[in-house]
């Protein structure tokens, strides 16, 4: 509460009247008291607008003559296409768990305040791996991918005190995550002590596959059991398809857990360029000292 009062310039004795608290989150009460609050970065009250919803997905109409019935949304991440096709991958390739599906592609987010270009843009290149594993082994696989992805950046030349691996606190975790670690880099244009995120490794559990199934697996009978709400309607809006996996060796059927390394391609490229940039006293003034694994020219002989 003290932090909220400080940020919004509210006296502590008025905090209970101005704020509402729910599961560790602070919300303004929707009344006239908000107009007397000084917003962050403002010098006087009255700058806060009424709360309203924002759609963070880009809506478009498919077809030159399409109407609202032809509405579609640009994907905000590449991950969901992998989850939707999970069953197709298993059935067509006969792959066995644990296995992963990797993808590079464009994603689109209707950012409210796009800024800093590479770090907050409405269109960006995303690299993701969805690694499917048995629930009992998911924590070990999370640690594996967390450490392996960090080492990957080290092997490419990002090392020293400019690169770090930071685990999320409990109040930072996304709604689908049971554990997340961020690989961060101290870009030279950031203030001292600040880092920019390169990649996040998240333990997504079975959240995505269960959401797409529109139900939950009954461990006693194995078939998909549809969950309903108090009105008898489906509780989850999914496909209704069975996305469980059966281990042929044990006949164990389960919903796989997912470990997701997710990175911005342009962020990693920018970090490698910053790391390679080397001032020089010679006439060239500067040269790029790339790691040999990514150097376009491995060696040269000059007269």
Give residue spans per PLM region.
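TRNA-recognition modules of translation machinery and tRNA-sensing kinases, especially anticodon-binding
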Residues: 1-303
